[in-house]
Curated annotation (Swiss-Prot):
This protein's name: Aspartate carbamoyltransferase catalytic subunit
Pfam families: OTCace (PF00185), OTCace_N (PF02729)
Classification via Gene3D superfamilies: Aspartate/ornithine carbamoyltransferase (3.40.50.1370)
Name of the gene this protein is made from: pyrB
Family: Belongs to the aspartate/ornithine carbamoyltransferase superfamily. ATCase family.
Record: residues binding carbamoyl phosphate: 58-59, 108, 136, 139, 264-265
Function per UniProt: Catalyzes the condensation of carbamoyl phosphate and aspartate to form carbamoyl aspartate and inorganic phosphate, the committed step in the de novo pyrimidine nucleotide biosynthesis pathway.
MF (Gene Ontology): amino acid binding; aspartate carbamoyltransferase activity
Enzyme class of the recorded protein, top EC level: transferase
Assembly information from the UniProt record: Heterododecamer (2C3:3R2) of six catalytic PyrB chains organized as two trimers (C3), and six regulatory PyrI chains organized as three dimers (R2).
Pathway terms, separated by semicolons: Pyrimidine metabolism; UMP biosynthesis via de novo pathway; (S)-dihydroorotate from bicarbonate: step 2/3
Residue sites binding L-aspartate per the record: 86, 169, 223
GO cellular component: cytosol
Reactions listed under catalytic activity: carbamoyl phosphate + L-aspartate = N-carbamoyl-L-aspartate + phosphate + H(+)
Amino acid sequence: MPWTRRHLLTLEELSREEIDQIHATAAAFKRTLSRRVKKVPALRGKTIVNLFLEPSTRTRMAFDMAAKRLSADVISFDAASSSTTKGETLHDTAKNIQALGADMIVIRHAAAGSPLYLSRILDIPVINAGDGAHEHPTQGLLDTFTMKEHLGSLKGRKIVILGDILFSRVARSNIHALTKLGANVTLVGPATLVPHWFTDLGVEVSHDLRTALADAEVVMLLRIQHERQSSGHFPSLGEYTSMFGLNKTRASWLNPKAIIMHPGPINRGVEIDSDLADGDHSVILEQVNNGIAVRMAALYLCAGGQPENVAPIE
């Protein structure tokens, strides 16, 4: 089916077929990234602005690289030296970026709903690179893309997401993608960070780590989001680690072929021990690498490209 969306704002609104289309497009682009010449001319002549109003390492660099691999011109917005420090609103900033001739905006913002707002006031495509604790759609797409590379179909697979679910936009995007792809998802962590109402999203909630990890084929660790918490949700990091940190003993409860994932940044020794983060079952750096191809797919499709046209570009 043809791709018809101009914006990528949330995985909640995508169908399983659309997620599969993005993954298939990403797989085609990933093949181009293994060549000696890694660029394709898909977005030549287009200007993409990365409007990051929250700190980022992996996502910002991956969007930069993805746009350049597509031959687009890229402008990365530096909030610290911009007029936002003088009180300019997001509305005015975005309108001025469009007036300067940008063809697409990739936005990260602390306020949930910011990408949706821009999609309503601008005439150019908008991609959500993370909005508050709401969603991080390209992270959910690259995570599920990585899982499919290792497991094939995710239908019926046992996936555990462990950590700060309440404040995690990554968790929400993964929940939407995984449930649409047929996975059995269990959320694990302290009751204060994994409230029971998450079951309304079609997942299981557990506060018993051993039971949750038993035979899981994927475990995704999430860091504690101190910057989004206004009050303590557990006594200390040490207590969190003692109850829910992933170490070798607890990893032995997983399926023997399980993969270990983390969207980063990692708090080593808190949610995961270093020997596991760097071990044979870890696919954390594969996630980072896959982020380029997946974001190439998102940029290409939102710019008007079609999945079936990627192969000739190769």
